[in-house]
Amino acid sequence: MSFETFNFTAAINKAITESGYKDPTEIQQKSIPEILLNKHILASAQTGTGKTAAFVLPILELLLQDKNKVRGPRVLIVSPTRELANQITDSVKKYARHTNINSATVVGGMSYKLQNKLLSKPLDILIATPGRLLDLFKQGKIKFKDTKIMVLDEADKMLDMGFVPDIRKIFNATTKQQQMLMFSATLDKSVSKIASEFLTNPLTISIKPDTKGHSN
């Protein structure tokens, strides 16, 4: 299988080529077509298997297909730590660089003034840590009525760090009609339980830990 199988737009294919990717990794082969079909996904994949691209690439494609003009954010990506959120931000910028899709990141440690400025403009993709996202929502700086896709990345880590109550509050503030994507290094009972709360009839994808791929 090659990336051409997914029929991405030329702008995304150009970014994939420039990133040096030849063939999609296993998590990408299994996730991308299903995400493009707007399915809810519960996926288990280790870091280094290309899981970030597995959700970012099809999300960008779906955004390009949606011509509706809204304030956004149209996509919400929640990550447990500032470091992981910044890594996702780098990937989004890399894959979207030949498009007009814009993104912003709100995490702990950044000034509220800067983040408020980022949120004052129409936004396609918002990448955030749970605590800061919830703070900004409570302040009325973010609304989720336009959110069509929500990603919970590193779900097992968010569980370990005690973020589930925050995630629940954020989820309850959405329309609950959005496509839900949940990625985790493990799929134990606690992760599956949380998934059952947020996802509707999800397709479960599990990639063995020894599967290797490109880093993003």
Which residues does each predicted region cover?
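The conserved Walker
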Residues: 45-49
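Walker A/P-loop NTP-binding motif
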Residues: 29-41, 52-69, 86, 91-95, ...
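Proline-centered helix-kink/hinge sites
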Residues: 24-27, 33-34, 58, 73, ...
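Conserved nucleic-acid-binding Ia/Ib motif block in the N-terminal RecA-like helicase ATPase lobe
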Residues: 5, 11-14, 18-21, 68-138, ...
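Conserved pre-motif I regulatory segment
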Residues: 1-44
